[in-house]
């Protein structure tokens, strides 16, 4: 009988020892770190929330294309033209076409564009959208320009001038 009791006591002590060792809660949970820096992910144009007025659009467009400011009278006349046409996007297309058909537009030649496409893309983004392009944008435009031999700097400038992002500052 003594043997039976001692084996039960031994079993009981073993069970308590195992349970006390296996059921310990961590004192403080450790934060898992994978060596990645925390980064706020926002779109490149997140800071642009104010819509340009017609006068601002015309003045900035002319300055981007010619690197010279328009007179107040010219800005007023062109903005009146925009307001008189019901479709503002159509009016912008006409204004950009008229500006592009004038002499004095400062843009690289097609040979210069194709010689250094990356530089052309970065310069165009900084000139029109006032920001650096993302690597995805650079890759997209590089592939697009290489794949389409009919793309000219004039078409790229035209498309940037018509982009939705260009309407905001």
Q: For each of these PLM feature ranges, what is it?
A:
Residues 12-16:
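Hydrophobic helical h-region of N-terminal Sec-dependent signal peptides
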Residues 1-10:
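Bacterial N-terminal signal peptides that target proteins for export
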Residues 19-22:
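C-terminal motif of bacterial Sec signal peptides marking the signal peptidase cleavage site
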Residues 24-169:
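Substrate/cofactor-recognition hotspot
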């Amino acid at each position: 009988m003594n043997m039976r009791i001692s084996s039960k006591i031994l079993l009981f002590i073993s069970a308590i020892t195992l349970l006390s060792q296996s059921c310990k809660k961590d004192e403080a949970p450790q934060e898992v770190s994978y060596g990645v820096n925390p980064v706020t992910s926002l779109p490149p144009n997140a800071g642009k929330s104010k819509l340009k007025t017609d006068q601002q659009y015309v003045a900035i467009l002319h300055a981007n294309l010619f690197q010279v400011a328009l007179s107040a009278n010219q800005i007023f006349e062109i903005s009146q033209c925009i307001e008189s046409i019901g479709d503002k996007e159509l009016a912008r297309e006409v204004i950009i076409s008229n500006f592009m058909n004038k002499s004095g537009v400062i843009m690289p030649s097609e040979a210069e564009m194709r010689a250094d496409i990356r530089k052309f893309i970065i310069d165009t983004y900084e000139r029109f959208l006032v920001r650096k392009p993302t690597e995805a944008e650079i890759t997209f435009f590089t592939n697009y320009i290489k794949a389409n031999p009919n793309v000219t700097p004039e078409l790229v400038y035209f498309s940037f001038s018509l982009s939705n992002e260009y309407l905001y500052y």
